[in-house]
Amino acid sequence: MKNWIKLKLTAIGWFIYGMPISVFYRYLWLRNKTLLFKTIAVHYIIPLIIELLPWYASKRKIGNYLRTSRVEITHTMSTNGPYSHSAVIKYVLLTIYYAILDNINSHLISIVSLENRLQIRRLVMEKLLYSEIGAFDFLRKKKNIGPAELEYKLSSSINTTISFFTYTIPDLIASIYAFVIEGSELLKKGHKIDPLIVLHPILIAIYQKVSQKLRERLVENNPDSSKFKDPYNSAMSKMISNTAEGLSDIQINNLQETQLGLFDNLIEKELSNTQSFSTLISRTWRSIHNRSLFEFAAEVWVAHKVMDRQKIDNQLYRTTLLDINRVIRLGNRLFQSLGSFKNIYKHQKKVKKLLNIPTFIEEDSHLKYIYKFEELKVSSDLKFSYENKFSSELPSFPVLDLQNEMVILPNKRYALIGQNRSGKSTLNHLLCKLYTPTEGQISMNGIPYSEISRSSIRRMISYVSQRPFIFPGTIMDNIRVGNPSATEEQVLEAADAAGVFAFADDNNFSLKQSFDSLSDTFDPDMEIPPTISPLSTSSNNINNTTTTTTNNNNNNNNNNNNNNNNNNNNNNNNNNNNNNNNNNNNNNNNNKNNNNNNNKPTTPTFVPSSPSQYSTINKSTIINNNTFIRRNSSMSQLNNSGGGNVNGNNNNNNNNNNNNNININNSGVGGRRNSVMDLQNKLLNQCDESESNKLVKRVWSVLNLTSISNSGGGDESDDDDEEAERNQRSLTPIIVPQLIDGGLSNHPILNQVVEAGGKNISGGFAQSIALARIFVRTEAKIVILDESMSQMDAFKKREIIFPKLFGFAEKHNITLIIVTHDLASVQNTVDHIFVLDHGKLCHQGSHEELMNENAQVYYKLLGLRKRFKNQSFNNLNTNTNK
């Protein structure tokens, strides 16, 4: 017997311990003890003290006294009795005093209730932040509700449960006490109580309930109007919001009239509801009910009958009626409080399940914390399957069944590749301990993940997904998600490394610097790729080459003479002596060129027939177009190396170009190609500018600023060029971020505001912002890039991201795990490749090892159908093209 009682008491104790009110009070004890004490005092202690105080401090007793006084004053007035000034003053003062007490009590309850609701929402937020991914999905089984509705549903359920214990139960106890006291006092007057006076309020209450139900059943809930009351208004609101979200798709597909037709249909249904006959009946019924017509008629009849049978006056009748109504209202409160037990039980189960969700806070308190990374190992028996939360009938198939071991070492680069739905992202989520494996284990430094705290793993691993979430705010705020304490200099450096400033690069600036530094090495007959030829199309000195070999020497002589004469025309009117010297030098150059050409065998000129046809460009064209670029470039501070005495430099430039022409003619077509390749390499080398010039160039390209000076022609002097250059520098606004007292000011990109989800920016730019987060988080020793550059252009990845990323990883001893479908960009830059296929790790090794091992899945991902022995992937592509 004793054991049975002990077991029952233990079960009751555990039940109370697991009740939501107990969990919430324990939460307040750990987080906010002050609020816990206020809650207990306001809801339990103060009402008890007030009830035990004398009548002048008890709300209930003051209320009874005020009701009796009001009836007495009203009766004296109706019977034309003497006016009592003191009774009226006393009634007014007591009413004010009662209102003050009632509002103080209500104010305290509202303050504590608001604080409790806010703490409940914080509890939900804490559970959401520190719980397993998908832990809240049990609330979304029946209805696919959104995050806002989910939070409201959780908070309201918890608040209802907590309010039951903090408000309903204390109010129930107070109602029981008042009902007993008021009922006993009423029974003392039983000899003066007529049955009609007791039945009257009960019958009135029954009538009101029946009238309300009839109106709802017969009028408002008839088949014609049951669904028209509110759903169509909400449907209109949802339709407008959906239209605003998908406006671009609607306009592109010309769905405006279709949408308006649907909206007109909703309007017609809403109007049919408003204009229906049932609406008129309902409004008439409500108007009669609001006037209390039948209640008044019944009250007059009952009053005359009771006063006539009991031989009492109106004052005693009114007093007795108010006392009876007071007891009936207390009984109604008791009935409603007891009825709330049924509703609270459903919330109780849901809230208890929610509050029992474990959080990382409790977990981290007894798990190990890792401070360094030595090895990350994934067992070969690793399996994982997503729980089917929306259908218990369908089985859960494993997404991952690795079947091979994975080992990740420090300071290495890894690639994780596979087809879509091969399990790459799921494996990354397991490595970040966002999910827990169904079978098998992952270990770091020989310690299983189950024994390592999540915060420790997240400190070691930095992860960027393919679709990162962009938070509403500035770009700087979004970059600081990776490290909230990052300095503005670190954010600026990270943004530059992630290509945030490079999404609209200007090639004219690079070409301008290249022309300035390489003008002495250009040959007038050199073939220029089409990417450069548009810069020289404004000049009339471009001559197409021919394939004729018999007159090649004469053509070369004529071209040189024409080019030199045009050059003199472009730089004329400075002084006559310079013109004469130029003409003499031109003649000497032409003679030298003729002699050289006559002594050399003719070489057929290469004429491409493809769309990427090359054009010839001579020295004077380069110099003139260099001036044109300098005047029209809105990207940079101009380089003075291209200025100076143009006429004085023409002779040397002509000689150099003619000599270069001789060398090119000797080398033939192959020499021309090599020269073009050398030129392209020099241009790329010259494009590697300083960080500050890069920042100026990229920021300017973002703002689409144009040059203030007009485009220059060939008639202006060099002095005018320099003056225009100085004016442009003086009028150029300073938009480079200036460090003032350790802070960035007037930054046009980092201070740009983005919407939630990055709706107002491109996908590639959003990926650059998310990628910048890893550059401000140097404490991480493993960086996982899960298709985080899939929407970036190839130039940005090749020329900006990868060099900065690899340098950053090498500097901070970081291991890189790159998930990508662009195998050509990583196959020769990583140390090890993991190949997944349908959740299985089918191949692993370097690119050469996988090619030599005839890794079939890897071949398929490369787009190859069979193995070519003793050939690399690049050779395979070359042979295929041939």
Curated annotation (Swiss-Prot):
<dbReference type="GO" id="GO:0055085">
    <property type="term" value="P:transmembrane transport"/>
</dbReference>
<keyword id="KW-1133">Transmembrane helix</keyword>
<keyword id="KW-0812">Transmembrane</keyword>
<dbReference type="GO" id="GO:0042626">
    <property type="term" value="F:ATPase-coupled transmembrane transporter activity"/>
</dbReference>
<dbReference type="InterPro" id="IPR036640">
    <property type="entry name" value="ABC1_TM_sf"/>
</dbReference>
<dbReference type="InterPro" id="IPR003593">
    <property type="entry name" value="AAA+_ATPase"/>
</dbReference>
<feature type="compositionally biased region" description="Acidic residues">
    <location>
        <begin position="715"/>
        <end position="724"/>
    </location>
</feature>
<dbReference type="GO" id="GO:0016020">
    <property type="term" value="C:membrane"/>
</dbReference>
<dbReference type="GO" id="GO:0016887">
    <property type="term" value="F:ATP hydrolysis activity"/>
</dbReference>
<feature type="region of interest" description="Disordered">
    <location>
        <begin position="634"/>
        <end position="669"/>
    </location>
</feature>
<dbReference type="Pfam" id="PF00005">
    <property type="entry name" value="ABC_tran"/>
</dbReference>
<keyword id="KW-0472">Membrane</keyword>
<comment type="similarity">
    <text>Belongs to the ABC transporter superfamily. ABCH family.</text>
</comment>
<feature type="transmembrane region" description="Helical">
    <location>
        <begin position="4"/>
        <end position="24"/>
    </location>
</feature>
<dbReference type="InterPro" id="IPR039421">
    <property type="entry name" value="Type_1_exporter"/>
</dbReference>
<feature type="domain" description="ABC transporter">
    <location>
        <begin position="384"/>
        <end position="863"/>
    </location>
</feature>
<keyword id="KW-0813">Transport</keyword>
<dbReference type="InterPro" id="IPR027417">
    <property type="entry name" value="P-loop_NTPase"/>
</dbReference>
<dbReference type="InterPro" id="IPR003439">
    <property type="entry name" value="ABC_transporter-like_ATP-bd"/>
</dbReference>
<dbReference type="GO" id="GO:0005524">
    <property type="term" value="F:ATP binding"/>
</dbReference>
<keyword id="KW-0067">ATP-binding</keyword>
<feature type="transmembrane region" description="Helical">
    <location>
        <begin position="79"/>
        <end position="101"/>
    </location>
</feature>
<feature type="transmembrane region" description="Helical">
    <location>
        <begin position="35"/>
        <end position="55"/>
    </location>
</feature>
<feature type="region of interest" description="Disordered">
    <location>
        <begin position="710"/>
        <end position="730"/>
    </location>
</feature>
<feature type="binding site">
    <location>
        <begin position="418"/>
        <end position="425"/>
    </location>
    <ligand>
        <name>ATP</name>
    </ligand>
</feature>
<protein>
    <recommendedName>
        <fullName>ABC transporter H family member 4</fullName>
    </recommendedName>
</protein>
<feature type="region of interest" description="Disordered">
    <location>
        <begin position="522"/>
        <end position="617"/>
    </location>
</feature>
<feature type="compositionally biased region" description="Low complexity">
    <location>
        <begin position="528"/>
        <end position="617"/>
    </location>
</feature>
<keyword id="KW-0547">Nucleotide-binding</keyword>
<feature type="compositionally biased region" description="Low complexity">
    <location>
        <begin position="647"/>
        <end position="667"/>
    </location>
</feature>
